């Protein structure tokens, strides 16, 4: 370890504070070298028992990105129609109000998607899918440790990164292995990062 090249604590904290989920993305592609550095940073994250059962898949083909967005919207649209059916809503909402937190938003997402907007990927030009074997009991924890490494590396490279919670939720709600086939992965997706060149850089910190 070359300790002389390690950043000062103040520099590390500066990077952490500067990292924000900038959803204003441009269509410019991310250089391959930057993408590889992001993946490399993710690979160096620790894993439980040093099992290293974490895999990383980059998706950069526009058609495949669109299929992932279509899949996500389709899962949510189907769910929204079921939840918002008058009979179902009357019976279920008093018992499970938590299910209705995003029901209206799901329908809105479908309308935005059909209008040609991109409410899911935000016009990201790449997705980093972090996945683990289904048998890995701590796969989620391992994957999200790797995600944070990748996120900070992306920030240092001037690449915006957005946690794809909607895509991850749809992958879990959809038919078994449907997302895995579309995304070209094995195992279970545990964390998904959208990546893109930002239209601008934030000049102020956000208070936490």
Which positions does each model-derived feature cover?
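Acidic, surface-exposed loops and disordered segments
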Residues: 1-208
């Amino acid at each position: 370890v070359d300790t002389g090249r390690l950043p000062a604590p103040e520099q590390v904290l500066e990077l952490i504070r500067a990292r924000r989920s900038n959803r204003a993305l441009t269509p410019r592609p991310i250089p391959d070298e930057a993408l590889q550095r992001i993946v490399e940073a993710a690979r160096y994250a620790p894993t439980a028992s040093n099992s290293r059962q974490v895999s990383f898949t980059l998706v950069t083909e526009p058609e495949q990105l669109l299929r992932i967005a279509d899949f996500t919207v389709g899962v949510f649209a189907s769910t929204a129609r079921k939840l918002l059916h008058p009979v179902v809503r009357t019976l279920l909402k008093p018992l499970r109000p938590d299910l209705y937190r995003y029901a209206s938003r799901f329908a809105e997402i479908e309308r935005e998607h059909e209008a040609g907007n991109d409410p899911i990927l935000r016009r990201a030009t790449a997705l980093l899918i972090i996945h683990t074997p289904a048998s890995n009991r701590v796969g989620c924890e391992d994957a999200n440790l790797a995600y944070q490494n990748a996120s900070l590396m992306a920030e240092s490279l001037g690449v915006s990164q957005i946690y794809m919670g909607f895509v991850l939720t749809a992958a879990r709600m959809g038919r078994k292995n449907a997302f895995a086939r579309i995304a070209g992965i094995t195992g279970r997706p545990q964390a998904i990062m959208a990546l893109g060149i930002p239209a601008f850089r934030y000049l102020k910190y956000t208070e936490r």
